């Protein structure tokens, strides 16, 4: 229930006491940023953190600004929809909302550019992923949900978006690793499985430590589903130091395959 100005002043105060313990592993100071599209929070927090007497080289006393955005495929927060029982409309609703991540990064990134044109401050998307209704019969407080190819595609398009904004997005954490929301691993007693989302992360690992290559797709079909206009294909491309090029191409169509 804080105003952004009040929070930012508290942040400025307490970050003063957080010092590096060793130069080889400097502490990264992450300021609490916006939830989804709350650009007023971003504006006011940055305005306050950069206000005099902040030194110019302190870049707002932060190394990163956090951002949360969950894909809620259902009609509302109170009706999120099932993770496994969904229609074609539900497929496209999830992907359309996942693609909104691109708009959010551009919106908050543009505000950051006003204060930090050199992009020293990372946008830290520290909570993202699908948020469905909990699996029937499980403790609702544990947020346990199943995982399908729809979740895999949401992960794929989101990681492609992060790749394309790697000059500003410096960290991104799916929520969460095991047994909660869009997990990469599900367990029950001594048993465990790797989810479709896990396999997306495994396939995308070749982008790590690589350099982004500019890429665009032409002649791609657009799928119109209600309020969402969704490209049938979406991609990101990188090149490793040895010249190996990695292309991750996501097919968003629920019905059409592409050669």
Model regions and ranges:
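Aromatic/acidic polysaccharide-binding cleft in carbohydrate-active enzymes
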Residues: 69, 120-238, 242
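Short, well-ordered beta-strand segments enriched in hydrophobic/aromatic residues
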Residues: 243-251
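Glycine/Thr-rich phosphate-binding loops of Rossmann-like dinucleotide-binding domains
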Residues: 75, 182, 257
């Amino acid at each position: 229930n804080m105003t952004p100005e009040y929070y930012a002043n508290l942040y400025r105060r307490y970050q003063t006491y957080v010092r590096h313990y060793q130069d080889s592993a400097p502490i990264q100071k992450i300021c609490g940023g916006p939830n989804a599209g709350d650009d007023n929070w971003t504006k006011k927090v940055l305005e306050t953190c950069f206000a005099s007497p902040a030194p110019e080289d302190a870049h707002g006393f932060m190394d990163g600004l956090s951002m949360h955005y969950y894909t809620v495929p259902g009609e509302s927060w109170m009706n999120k929809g099932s993770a496994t029982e969904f229609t074609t409309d539900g497929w496209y609703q999830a992907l359309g909302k996942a693609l909104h991540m691109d708009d959010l990064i551009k919106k908050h990134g543009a505000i950051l550019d006003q204060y930090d044109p050199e992009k020293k401050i990372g946008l830290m998307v520290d909570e993202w992923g699908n948020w469905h209704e909990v699996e029937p019969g499980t403790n609702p407080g544990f947020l346990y949900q199943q995982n399908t190819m729809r979740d895999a595609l949401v992960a794929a398009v989101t990681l492609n978006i992060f790749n394309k904004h790697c000059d500003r997005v410096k960290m991104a954490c799916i929520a969460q690793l095991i047994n909660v929301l869009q997990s990469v691993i599900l367990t029950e007693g001594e048993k465990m499985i790797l989810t479709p989302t896990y396999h997306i992360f495994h396939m995308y690992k070749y982008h790590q430590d690589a350099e982004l290559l500019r890429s665009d797709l032409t002649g791609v079909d657009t799928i119109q589903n209600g309020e969402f206009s969704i490209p049938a294909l979406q991609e990101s491309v990188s090149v490793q130091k040895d010249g190996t090029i990695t292309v991750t191409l996501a097919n968003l169509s629920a019905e059409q395959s592409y050669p």
